């Protein structure tokens, strides 16, 4: 599974989605199977067997990836990041688990790929949104393992959709004006205009 999939892509809206991959589901099934096996072969009471199954199930959910969405809306000038955690929802009895963050699209200045350590599994990659306010915000809460190319491809898609390269060029032109303008501001014009006629003083004496 790639980093994120494109759910919808128009000239004004880009909708990205991500769901738990095969690794997450494999971990869930594997840890839950350990709990079931412990309960099946154990001679303990029914309460202990339920504890084995429930404990392993929650450990598996804790290590499971989340469902995530990102919506870039040009017409509303906003970025909407949504996260759904099954573990948090069950732990809080459905009171929490859905999180939403709204960012101002006009403050977005750059999109980059960042490397991050993934617990027990090595290094992964994720996209980071860099804002004009100086803050950076990850596009997803967890990094993806494997090839960096999928994450870089998504970052390139975001840059094209939002026109960030053109924006960065305009900002650079505003910060560093043409050299000719700087010379004029210092009062350095044509050197021939500032030189006096060497024979001018002699003519006035005569």
From Swiss-Prot:
Where this protein primarily resides, as one coarse class?
A: endoplasmic reticulum
State which residue ranges cross the membrane. 21-43
Q: Record's superkingdom?
A: Eukaryota
Annotated Gene Ontology cellular component terms: endoplasmic reticulum; endoplasmic reticulum membrane
GO biological process: what's one of them? innate immune response
Q: What is the documented function of this protein?
A: Functions as a chaperone necessary for a stable expression of the CYBA and CYBB subunits of the cytochrome b-245 heterodimer.
Please give the family membership noted in the entry: Belongs to the CYBC1 family.
Q: What is this protein called?
A: Cytochrome b-245 chaperone 1 homolog
Q: What is the organism field in this record?
A: Danio rerio (Zebrafish)
């Amino acid at each position: 599974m790639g980093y994120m999939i494109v759910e919808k892509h128009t000239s004004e809206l880009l909708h990205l989605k991500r769901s738990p991959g095969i690794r997450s589901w494999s971990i869930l099934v594997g840890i839950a199977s350990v709990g079931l096996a412990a309960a099946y072969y154990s001679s303990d009471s029914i309460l202990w067997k339920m504890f084995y199954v429930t404990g392993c199930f929650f450990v598996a959910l804790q290590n499971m990836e989340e469902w995530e969405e990102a919506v870039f809306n040009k017409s509303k000038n906003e970025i909407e990041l949504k996260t759904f955690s099954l573990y948090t929802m069950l732990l809080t009895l459905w009171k929490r688990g859905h999180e939403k963050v709204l960012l101002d699209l006009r403050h977005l200045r750059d999109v980059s790929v960042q490397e991050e350590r993934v617990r027990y599994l090595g290094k992964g990659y994720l996209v980071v949104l860099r804002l004009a306010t100086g803050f950076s915000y990850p596009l997803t809460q967890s990094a993806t393992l494997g090839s960096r190319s999928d994450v870089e491809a998504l970052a390139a898609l975001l840059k094209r959709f939002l026109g960030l390269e053109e924006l960065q060029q305009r900002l650079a032109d505003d910060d560093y004006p043409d050299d000719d303008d700087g010379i004029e501001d210092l009062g350095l014009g044509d050197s021939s205009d500032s030189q006096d006629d060497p024979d001018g003083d002699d003519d006035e004496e005569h």
